[in-house]
Amino acid sequence: MNFVLLALAILSFPLAFAQFGHFFQQGFPFGGGFQQQQQQQEQHAPGRQHKGWTESERVHCRAGYVCPASLACVPTPADCPCPYPEDIKCVIPDNRPRDEGEGPPFVCVRGDTGCAQVLEFSKPI
């Protein structure tokens, strides 16, 4: 009786593997399919996710800097416009020395308060 059960188990293994073998190869990380799928995703995913970074390489800018959000050509990154027309560009007060061509820090805000809230939050504690 034990011999029959053992023989039945051994003979049913190829059938089970034929039925579920693909699942074990592709469904779990140890099957090899996971690595192939991950490598395919890495090949299709660009290194730079922001649309402007890839398109800015095609823009010819003599001023020196292409803004990634708007693709505007400006002399320095601080001169970039806000990405949306309804945004307001607020300069953050900063008295530190800057490198040549480096503009003041800024943030783009939206809403009724304008730059007043930015100035309030930028005060030292």
From Swiss-Prot:
Residues 33-52 are annotated as: Disordered. Residues 35-46 have a biased composition (Low complexity). Residues 1-18 form the signal peptide. InterPro entries: LCL2. It comes from the Eukaryota. Keywords: Signal. The keyword Signal applies. GO terms for biological process: ERAD pathway. Probable component of the endoplasmic reticulum-associated degradation (ERAD) pathway. Belongs to the LCL2 family. This is Long chronological lifespan protein 2. It comes from Cryptococcus gattii serotype B (strain WM276 / ATCC MYA-4071) (Filobasidiella gattii). The gene is LCL2.
